[in-house]
Amino acid sequence: MKPIQTVLVLGGDRRQQSLADALEAAGLAVRTFGLGEKSARAAADLEEAVARAQAVVLPLPCTKDETHIIGAAPQIPIDRLAALFLPEQLILGGMLTASVAARLQRGGCRVIDYYKCEEITVRNVVPTVQGILKQLFEQIDYTVFGSSACVCGYGRVGRATARTLNALGAQVTVCARSGAARASAETDGCASCDFQRLPEKAASFDYIINTVPAPVLGAQVLRILKPSCLILDVASAPYGTDFAAAERYGVRALQCASLPGKAAPKTAGEILAQGILHLWEEEGYV
C-alpha cells in the first residue's frame, strides 16, 4: 500500500475543520470541501478535489438521512459522491450504516467506519459529557447541586455523565438493564434501578439524560414526570425517547446530536485526527 499523503476532508461541522488542521500539522497535504472555509486549502470543485485525494474523510455522523453528506454546503448527495471514488482510494466515515457503506464502496474503493475505532470512542466521551453539561446548564434555572437526576444506560457515556453529575452534587439514579451495570453505578455512589421500576421513580426526577439507542422513555414513563422535568436524549438513532408522546404530555424532550462538535469542536476534531492516523498506521497506510 502507498503511504497516504493527500487527504480530502468533506462536510460536517467545526470538528472537520479541526480535523483538517491536525492532519495538516501531521505533514499531510489536506484539502477541504463543503466546510465553508475561505482558506487556500478549500477546494472549489468537488470532482477535482476527490480525484486528487488518496483518502477522503467524511463526517461523524456521515449522514442523517442516508441521502446527503451531513453538514456539507452545498449539499452533496451520497450517490453522486460515491460515483467519483476510485478503486485505489480509502474512504473513511463515522457511524456508517451497512447501506451507506455499500453505496460508498460500489466503485471498488475501501471504506472504513472510523467510529468503530475504540480509541476514538473512548476519547470522545470527554467532549460528549461536556456537551451534555452545556445543554443541561442552558436549559435549567437551578443548580445541579441538590438536583434529582436520572441517567438511562451505563455504557461509557452514561457512566461518565453519572459520575460527573454526582461530583457536582446531584442525586443520581442510574437506570440500566444489566445487574452488573447497576452494581457498578452503586459502587460509583449512585442509586440504581432497572427499566421495569423506572415508572415508580420517574415523578421524582428534575431531569433525565438518556444514552440508550432503544425505546426506554415511552408514555408509561412520560405521563408520570413532573411538568418541569427535562429530558436530554443523547443516544444515537433511533434514540430512546418517544418524542411524540413527550409533546402530548407537555414534557420538554430534546434530541441532542453531535454534542462534541458543538461543545468542544477543536478537541473533538483532534481526537478524530489522532485516531484516524493511528488507524492508518495499523492498516499499513503510513
Residue ranges and their predicted role:
Residues 26-40, 168-188:
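NAD(P)-binding Rossmann-fold cofactor-contacting core
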Residues 61-65, 74-91, 187-261:
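Rossmann-like adenosine-cofactor binding region
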Residues 8-18, 23, 145-165:
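Glycine-rich adenosine-cofactor-binding loop
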Residues 2-3, 58-145, 256, 275:
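Glycine/serine-rich phosphate-binding loop and adjoining beta1-alpha1 elements at the start
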Residues 5-47:
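N-terminal glycine-/charge-rich "phosphate-binding" loop or analogous flexible N-terminal tail
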Residues 6, 29, 90, 148, ...:
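Residues at the starts of beta-strands that form the adenosine-phosphate
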Residues 13, 36, 97, 177-178, ...:
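Residues in the short beta-alpha loop(s) of Rossmann-like NAD(P)-binding domains
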Residues 95-114, 234-280:
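Rossmann-fold NAD(P)-binding glycine/threonine-rich loop
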